[in-house]
Regions:
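Alpha-helical transmembrane segments of multi-pass membrane proteins
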Residues: 123-149, 176, 342-370
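Membrane-proximal transmembrane or re-entrant/amphipathic helices at the cytosolic face
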Residues: 460-518
């Protein structure tokens, strides 16, 4: 049963990845259009600074709630059935709306001082624009809160479709505006962001209604599950937003550097986190509820198998992705963004940041897996402490590296802090969970060697193709050819080294789709 469960998790992770990939392709098109319209200048810096402030303060609460509520909802359903679960949904959503409203009012009043913290290098009109955009975008937090609570409810039922699909209308709204507007503005872009955020909840409504869910505003602060949620959510908020806090620190320091440094870090981070937001989120989204249920059943064997499988899958994707981004950082940024207001200078700035963000992709992805393991056991303080450590390390590395390396040093600092704390989390988990550690380490080394072979081959391939790139179209073509061949080389190498997860994943997908076609 355990084997079928984690193989089934691989299949659903793959299926969710397909939908997420469609969404992320649209998201990249959205980013390309944004870069074309605004480039890497003051306006885009103001928008990205305002958005990072909104997400880090208000979005953090929503993200923390989602992670906290999946095991809570599962426990309520187990002990009190569907009716109890639906009743608690109304309670927690009511509290969320109240808290989000209070935070929104406070942020509106304190937007000025907050903007100075976010961008210490900006004064005058630039500062005023950031303040205006923060105030304008505050309703986004309320929409995110509703979305995250609803998403947690559905994920606890192992319903993943709405989560995978919600990015499609979100990106479609952006794309429509950026294509239809004669001259897009950052104020218009913030309005579109609010509308797009609301669409993420609306796409969940059919699935929620099918479970006879009816919302009733109810503030029951004596609810035992609410008390447990409030105790658990604070450390989770801190630990789950470490990446965003680090990025905010990077952007704050980047505001003291050259114009466009903030936008360069933002675009580079978007490219870097594509793998996280598509494949790793898909894996953790599917595995987390299964881990939670396995822990609740005290099934030690299945818990270890699910954990080991998810770690191996994450490594299988992120290690070659990180190596590929390191080798091809310049052509990827050039082809994705260099057009319109996004000139060659912006490409150089952004590709430099991507080069040093890429290694942190591995640490960030593994950290997500490890956090889910702790959350399944409702051990929320450990991720919080390692979160604090990540921020402290990032600040230390920032001040060491910013002078010799500029904005690239900020990116490298983020990567180093993520890698170090993910290693620390691994050593803590190995004392908690019984899993085949030897096999996991051997798999890691095999994947790393496969990735290095792929990286070396990719470097020489691109070097050989460069003289043939006499036009933009040929550059795009050769990049796709290079990436395709690199993937083939990597998969062959993993199969040659006998990495079971490659064969298992392919066999599971083939078997599942084969049944549907039969």
């Amino acid at each position: 049963m355990g084997k079928n469960n984690y193989e089934n998790a691989k299949y659903w992770a793959m299926l969710v990845s397909v939908f997420l990939m469609i969404s992320k392709v649209m998201g990249f098109f959205r980013d390309v259009l944004t870069a074309r319209s605004f480039g890497a200048g003051h306006e885009s810096d103001a928008y990205f600074t305002a958005m990072s402030g909104i997400i880090i303060v208000i979005g953090a609460l929503g993200a923390g709630l989602q992670t906290t509520l999946v095991p809570i909802f599962s426990d309520i359903k187990k002990n009190h059935g569907r009716e109890g679960k639906n009743k608690y949904f109304s309670t927690i959503l009511s509290v969320t709306l109240l808290v989000m409203t209070i935070i929104t009012v406070l942020m509106f009043a304190l937007a000025g001082p907050f903007a100075r913290i976010l961008a210490i290098g900006y004064e005058g009109e630039m500062h005023d624009l950031i303040v205006f955009l923060i105030r304008q975008g505050l309703p986004i937090g309320i929409f995110l809160g509703i979305t995250y609570v609803s998403n947690a409810y559905l994920q606890s039922d192992e319903v993943y479709g709405p989560h995978a699909l919600m990015g499609i209308p979100y990106n479609l709204i952006f794309i429509t505006y950026l294509l239809a507007a004669k001259k897009p503005t950052v104020i218009g872009l913030m309005n579109v962001t609010m509308l797009a955020s609301a669409s993420q909840f609306l796409i969940q409504l059919p699935a929620l209604r099918s479970r006879k869910l009816r919302f009733k505003f109810e503030l029951n602060f004596r609810d035992e599950y609410l008390k447990r949620t409030l105790i658990l959510v604070v450390p989770i908020i801190i630990s789950s937003t470490v990446s965003q806090i680090n990025i905010m620190i990077d952007k704050t320091l980047a505001s003291t550097l050259t114009e466009g440094a903030i936008s360069a870090l933002n675009y580079a981070n978007k490219v870097n986190t594509l793998v996280v937001s598509v494949f790793v989120v898909a894996i953790t989204t599917v595995v987390f509820p299964k881990l939670t249920n396995a822990v609740l059943k005290r099934d030690v064997k299945e818990t270890g198998a699910l954990f080991s499988s998810s770690v191996n899958l994450v490594q299988l994707v992120t290690i070659p992705a990180a190596i590929g981004l390191i080798v091809l950082n310049r052509p990827i940024i050039s082809i994705l963004f260099q057009r319109g207001a996004f000139d060659e200078k912006a490409t150089i700035l952004t590709s430099g940041a991507l080069l040093f963000y890429a290694p942190g992709l591995i640490g960030q992805s593994l950290r997500m897996c490890f956090e889910n393991m702790f959350y399944s056991y409702q051990q929320t303080k450990i991720p919080m402490y390692t979160g604090f450590l990540t921020v402290i390390l990032n600040v230390i590395f920032n001040f060491i590296l910013i002078k010799p390396m500029g904005h690239r040093g900020l990116a490298l600092a983020t990567s180093l802090s993520m890698l170090i704390t993910s290693i620390i989390m691994y050593f803590i988990i190995r004392k908690m969970v019984k899993f085949n550690e030897k096999e996991t380490i051997i798999t890691f080394l095999k994947i790393l060697l496969s990735g290095i072979l792929m990286g070396v081959a990719t470097h020489f391939m691109w070097k050989a193709f460069t003289p043939l790139m006499t036009s933009r179209m040929k550059e795009v073509l050769f990049l796709f050819v290079t990436i395709f061949i690199a993937i083939v080389i990597y998969l062959l190498a993993t199969m040659l080294f006998g990495i079971k997860d490659t064969r298992t994943l392919l066999a599971t997908v083939k078997r599942k789709f084969g049944r549907k076609n039969a």
